[in-house]
């Protein structure tokens, strides 16, 4: 007989305490906007240099008072210093990209059976949507709804975390391995997804 597809409610009802893990305070990022608080989790296993740089920027209060600069329907909400006018020290302004990482037995990975047009294998790594390629032995975080990424210009090393974005629409998977992904939204995605859309030129 065909396998029964479970609803989200049924999946959650079937979980046990062992299926959940506490969020690490060291890797928790808070974004305060007028409508409330957005809570995000950083992913140092995939982008350690960018995560460290974002933490340094936060400690230096780099983001304090900056604006949400872009809200594009069915795409992203983005914030930071779009003009790069604010000093970043002691954090770096440019970092080598961390589009993917070496795969191996030390990387936890729960494989999904679904076929995927962007990666040989998809699933979750430490709770983050992820993909892997057994041929190249590389793994990366994927651009799914609520993904947290690093904005950049054309140069691959132009993103350091001074501009961040969250996916608020369909999964723009063409960005996988083209932009550094540093985490995901745990709570408050609806606050970003409901922001007024921008009307300015792109």
Residue ranges and their predicted role:
Residues 1-202:
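Cyclophilin-like peptidyl-prolyl cis-trans isomerases
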């Amino acid at each position: 007989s065909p396998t029964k597809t479970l609803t989200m409610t049924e999946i959650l009802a079937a979980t046990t305490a062992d299926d959940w893990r506490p969020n690490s305070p060291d890797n928790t990022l808070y974004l305060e906007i007028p409508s409330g608080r957005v809570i995000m989790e950083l992913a140092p296993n995939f982008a350690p240099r960018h995560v460290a740089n974002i933490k340094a920027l936060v400690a230096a209060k780099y983001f304090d008072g900056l604006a949400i600069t872009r809200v594009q329907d069915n795409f992203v909400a983005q914030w930071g210093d779009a003009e790069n006018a604010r000093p970043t020290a002691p954090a770096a302004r440019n970092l080598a990209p961390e589009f993917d990482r070496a795969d191996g037995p030390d990387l936890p990975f729960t494989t999904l059976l679904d076929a995927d047009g962007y990666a040989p294998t998809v699933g979750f790594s430490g709770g983050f949507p992820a993909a892997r390629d057994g041929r190249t032995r590389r793994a990366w975080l994927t651009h799914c709804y609520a993904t947290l990424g690093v904005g950049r210009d054309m140069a691959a090393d132009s993103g350091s975390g001074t501009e961040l974005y969250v996916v608020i629409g369909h999964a723009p998977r063409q960005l996988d391995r083209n932009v550094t992904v540093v985490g995901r939204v745990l709570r408050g995605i609806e606050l970003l997804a409901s922001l007024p859309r921008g009307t300015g030129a792109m």
